[in-house]
C-alpha cells in the first residue's frame, strides 16, 4: 500500500472559521441591484426569490458563494439584475439578520418585509399554540354525557 504523503484531509482544506465572528460593513444596493427575500430553494445553485420591486425572479447563486454561504428560505439577499433577462438575477450577497434589521430601520427594506421567518418554518408556531389548547368541561357537562 502506498505511503500517504499528503498534508491533511478535508478539514484542513476548509480552514478555520475566524472570519465568521467579524462584523462587516453594511452594503447598500447600487444601480442594477435589488433586495429580495428567498421564497424557496430549487437546487442546482438556484433559488426563487421575491424582489422588493414585486417581481418573482429565478436567482443563480454565484460560484464564490456556492457551498460557502448557505442560503435558506426566508433569507434576505442582494441580487444583481440582468439587462437581458428580467425574470432572472444573480445572488451577490446574503444579508445577516442584524444587517437586514438595520436596512429595515434605514428604510431600504419596506415595513411589510418579514425578517427571520422562513417560508418553511414560519407560521407553524401559531398552529402549534392552538393545537395545545384544551377544552375544559365543568362537572355539569360531564354528568350530561
Swiss-Prot record:
It comes from the Eukaryota. Residues 16-25 have a biased composition (Basic and acidic residues). Residues 1-25 are annotated as: Disordered. SMART domains: eIF1a (SM00652). Residues 22-96 form the S1-like domain. InterPro entries: NA-bd_OB-fold, RNA-binding_domain_S1_IF1, TIF_eIF-1A, TIF_eIF-1A_CS. One of its GO terms (molecular function) is translation initiation factor activity. Keywords: Initiation factor, Protein biosynthesis. It holds the Pfam family eIF-1a. Seems to be required for maximal rate of protein biosynthesis. Enhances ribosome dissociation into subunits and stabilizes the binding of the initiator Met-tRNA(I) to 40 S ribosomal subunits. HAMAP family: aIF_1A. This is Eukaryotic translation initiation factor 1A. It comes from Onobrychis viciifolia (Common sainfoin).
Amino acid at each position: 500500500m502506498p505511503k500517504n504523503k499528503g498534508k491533511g484531509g478535508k478539514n484542513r482544506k476548509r480552514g478555520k472559521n475566524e472570519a465568521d465572528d467579524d462584523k462587516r460593513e453594511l452594503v447598500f444596493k447600487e444601480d442594477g441591484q435589488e433586495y429580495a427575500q428567498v421564497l424557496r430553494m430549487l437546487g442546482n445553485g438556484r433559488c426563487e426569490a421575491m424582489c422588493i420591486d414585486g417581481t418573482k425572479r429565478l436567482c443563480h447563486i454565484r460560484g464564490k458563494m456556492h457551498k460557502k454561504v448557505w442560503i435558506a428560505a426566508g433569507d434576505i439577499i442582494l441580487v444583481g439584475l440582468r439587462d437581458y433577462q428580467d425574470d432572472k438575477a444573480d445572488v451577490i450577497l446574503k444579508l445577516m439578520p442584524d444587517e437586514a434589521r438595520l436596512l429595515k430601520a434605514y428604510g431600504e427594506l419596506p415595513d411589510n418585509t418579514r425578517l427571520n421567518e422562513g417560508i418553511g418554518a414560519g407560521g407553524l408556531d401559531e398552529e402549534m399554540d392552538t393545537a395545545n389548547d384544551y377544552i375544559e368541561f365543568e362537572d355539569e357537562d360531564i354528568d350530561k354525557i
